[in-house]
UniProtKB/Swiss-Prot annotation:
Keywords: Chlorophyll biosynthesis, Chloroplast, Iron, Metal-binding, NADP, Oxidoreductase, Photosynthesis, Plastid. This is Magnesium-protoporphyrin IX monomethyl ester [oxidative] cyclase. It comes from the Eukaryota. One of its GO terms (molecular function) is iron ion binding. It is found in: Plastid, Chloroplast. Its main location: plastid. Catalyzes the formation of the isocyclic ring in chlorophyll biosynthesis. Mediates the cyclase reaction, which results in the formation of divinylprotochlorophyllide (Pchlide) characteristic of all chlorophylls from magnesium-protoporphyrin IX 13-monomethyl ester (MgPMME). Pfam families: Rubrerythrin (PF02915). Signal peptide: none annotated. One of its GO terms (cellular component) is chloroplast. Belongs to the AcsF family. It catalyses: Mg-protoporphyrin IX 13-monomethyl ester + 3 NADPH + 3 O2 + 2 H(+) = 3,8-divinyl protochlorophyllide a + 3 NADP(+) + 5 H2O. The gene is acsF.
Length: 349
């Protein structure tokens, strides 16, 4: 018997760290002039049309077994991983599908790119939801569509955030895949075998958003762009780091040290971003991860306070110094002198 999960049944609260659903200014995006980067868009569109993974997401006989042998805590953490991943992929599907619909008459090349990316995201979400089904659960994607709150971002911010989301997704998947390729004894479920090809979808999507950013030079070439790029780099890195700090046991179950894994992913994503953004974060500064560790501990303490039985008023008072410490350390990271990446735009590949 399968249980359908909807938002009201999940234990995770809506927080800054949960996967989000976005909308944007469709009119502004329709009016964008992409002619300065037209060749790149046409090349990317041909890549999307090729649909290299059309036959990849097909379940094989390894899925046809009972997973009751998984230790209870590991199973719970893995199901949460699947749910969060499915929600994030489905969020991308909804955004890209809506963009393709709104832009098809005004910017057909960009519209078709979004349509084909929505195909990929839907495929990923469906594959993840089938995996959830192996544990007699199913994520109610229709309920998610109707019930989730949508966050408005201007196109510029959508480009920054989604470029980084796709690139960090690539590095997360490929890092896990390469680790489990070397240590198959830690592959607790067959979905990890699919990550090598899967992550190439993420990489291609990231390349599309890189082309969008480069087609709008004012998104990259002034002091405000530098400030926003630093902000989004820090936001994406800190969100992943704080989330994964709560899920150390899951990474242990697949043979990974979550901190070392996150450090590797952050470094690689930062290198990728340096090919597009005018600045990169100085992740090799010893203070960078020191401050992130403090943020992760503060966030963990805030969660522990939420989970105890103290009166709400007492909880609120106890949280104040933790919030102050958390945001103060994030500000310290933001103020670490960034690296000017313009010098490597034409040399780093």
């Amino acid at each position: 018997m399968q249980t359908t999960i909807n938002n009201g049944q999940t234990s995770s609260k809506e927080t800054l760290l949960t996967p989000r659903f976005y909308t944007t200014d469709f009119e502004e995006m329709a009016n964008m002039d992409i002619s300065g980067n037209q060749e790149d868009f046409l090349a990317i569109l041909e890549e999307f049309r090729a649909d290299y993974n059309s036959e990849h997401f097909i379940r094989d006989e390894e899925f046809n077994q009972s997973w009751s042998n998984l230790e209870h805590k590991t199973k719970s953490l893995f199901i949460e991983f699947l749910e969060r991943s499915c929600t994030a992929e489905f969020s991308g599907f909804l955004l890209y599908k809506e963009l393709s619909r709104k832009l098809k008459d005004r910017n057909p090349v960009i519209a078709e790119c979004f349509l084909l990316m929505s195909r990929d995201e839907a495929r990923h979400a469906g594959f993840l939801n089938k995996a959830i089904g192996d544990f007699n659960l199913s994520l109610d994607l229709g309920f998610l569509t109707k019930s989730r709150k949508y966050t408005f971002f201007s196109p510029k911010f959508i480009f920054y955030a989604t470029y980084l989301s796709e690139k960090i997704g690539y590095w997360r998947y490929i890092t896990i895949y390469r680790h489990l390729e070397q240590h198959p004894e830690h592959r607790i479920y067959p979905i990890f075998r699919f990550f090598e090809n899967w992550c190439q979808d993420e990489n291609r999507h990231g390349d599309f958003f890189a082309a969008l950013l480069k087609s709008q030079p004012h998104f990259l070439n002034d002091w405000k762009a530098k400030m926003w790029c630093r902000f989004f780099l820090l936001s994406v890195f800190a969100t992943m780091y704080l989330n994964d700090f709560q899920r150390i046991d899951f990474y242990n179950a697949i043979g990974l040290d979550s901190r070392q894994y996150d450090m590797q992913v952050i470094r690689k994503t930062n290198e990728s971003a340096a090919r597009v953004f005018p600045v990169a974060l100085d992740v090799d500064n010893p203070k960078f991860f020191k401050y992130l560790d403090t943020c992760a501990c503060d966030n963990r303490a805030l969660i522990d306070i939420d989970n105890n039985n103290s009166p709400l008023f007492i909880k609120s008072i106890v949280k104040i110094p933790l919030y102050f410490s958390l945001f103060a350390n994030l500000l310290k990271i933001y103020l670490i002198k960034p690296i000017d990446s313009k010098t490597v735009w034409n040399t780093v590949r």
